[in-house]
C-alpha cells in the first residue's frame, strides 16, 4: 500500500469531507431517492435517475476518501527544518525575467490549490525545487515556455 504524504491541514480537510458525505450528503440523497420513488414509474422518472446517479458519485468519492485516509502519511510541517526544499516547505521564488515574487507551499496531490499557493509535490515546479537551497536557480518547463526562478527563502510554517 503506497503511503500518500499530506499535511495535517490536508488530512483534516479529507476527514471533514468524508464526514460530510457520510453524515449529511448520503442521507439527503437517500431522501431524494425515496421521494422520487413515491412518484411512481421508475423507468421514466428523471428525478429518480438523477438521485441514483448522485448516490453513485457520492459513494465513489466516499470510497476514494476512505482509501486516501487509510494510506495517509501525515507530516507535521512545523517540526521540519533545514535549508533544503522538501515536502511541506514554503518557498519564496523570484521570477528571473519579471522580478515578480511568488510563494508556494509544497503539499500532497490531494491538497494542491495553485490559487492559494499550494502546489502538488508531483508538479513540475515542485519537482524542480526539491533538494534545492536558498540562492539556487531553477528552470521550469511550463506550458508558456521555460521559466527561470531563484529561491530566496525556504521555511517550514
Swiss-Prot record:
Q: Which InterPro entries match?
A: GreA/GreB_C_sf (IPR036953), TF_GreA/GreB_CS (IPR018151), Tscrpt_elong_fac_GreA (IPR006359), Tscrpt_elong_fac_GreA/B (IPR028624), Tscrpt_elong_fac_GreA/B_C (IPR001437), Tscrpt_elong_fac_GreA/B_fam (IPR023459), Tscrpt_elong_fac_GreA/B_N (IPR022691), Tscrpt_elong_fac_GreA/B_N_sf (IPR036805)
What's one GO BP annotation on this UniProt entry? DNA-templated transcription elongation
Kindly list the GO molecular function terms attached to this UniProt entry: DNA binding; RNA polymerase binding
A UniProt-annotated Pfam family:
GreA_GreB
| Record has DNA-binding as a keyword | yes
Q: Which UniProt keywords apply?
A: DNA-binding, Transcription, Transcription regulation
The record, for NCBIfam families, names: greA (TIGR01462), PRK00226.1-2 (NF001261), PRK00226.1-4 (NF001263), PRK00226.1-5 (NF001264)
The entry sums up its family as follows: Belongs to the GreA/GreB family.
Q: What does this protein do?
A: Necessary for efficient RNA polymerase transcription elongation past template-encoded arresting sites. The arresting sites in DNA have the property of trapping a certain fraction of elongating RNA polymerases that pass through, resulting in locked ternary complexes. Cleavage of the nascent transcript by cleavage factors such as GreA or GreB allows the resumption of elongation from the new 3'terminus. GreA releases sequences of 2 to 3 nucleotides.
Known PANTHER family for this protein? TRANSCRIPTION ELONGATION FACTOR GREA (PTHR30437:SF4)
Listed name of the protein: Transcription elongation factor GreA
Taxonomic source organism: Mesorhizobium japonicum (strain LMG 29417 / CECT 9101 / MAFF 303099) (Mesorhizobium loti (strain MAFF 303099))
In the UniProt record, what gene is named as encoding this protein?
Answer: greA
Amino acid at each position: 500500500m503506497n503511503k500518500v504524504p499530506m499535511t495535517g491541514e490536508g488530512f483534516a480537510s479529507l476527514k471533514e469531507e468524508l464526514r460530510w458525505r457520510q453524515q449529511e450528503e448520503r442521507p439527503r440523497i437517500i431522501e431524494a431517492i425515496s421521494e422520487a420513488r413515491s412518484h411512481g414509474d421508475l423507468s421514466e422518472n428523471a428525478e429518480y435517475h438523477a438521485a441514483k446517479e448522485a448516490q453513485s458519485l457520492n459513494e465513489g468519492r466516499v470510497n476514494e476518501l476512505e482509501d486516501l485516509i487509510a494510506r495517509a502519511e501525515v507530516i507535521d510541517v512545523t517540526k521540519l527544518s533545514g535549508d533544503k526544499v522538501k515536502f511541506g516547505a514554503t518557498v519564496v521564488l523570484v521570477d528571473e525575467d519579471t522580478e515578480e515574487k511568488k510563494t508556494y507551499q509544497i503539499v500532497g496531490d490531494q491538497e494542491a490549490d495553485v490559487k492559494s499557493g499550494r502546489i502538488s509535490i508531483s508538479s513540475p515546479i515542485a519537482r524542480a525545487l526539491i533538494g534545492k537551497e536558498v540562492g539556487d536557480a531553477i528552470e521550469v518547463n511550463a506550458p508558456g515556455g521555460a521559466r527561470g526562478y531563484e529561491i530566496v527563502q525556504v521555511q517550514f510554517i
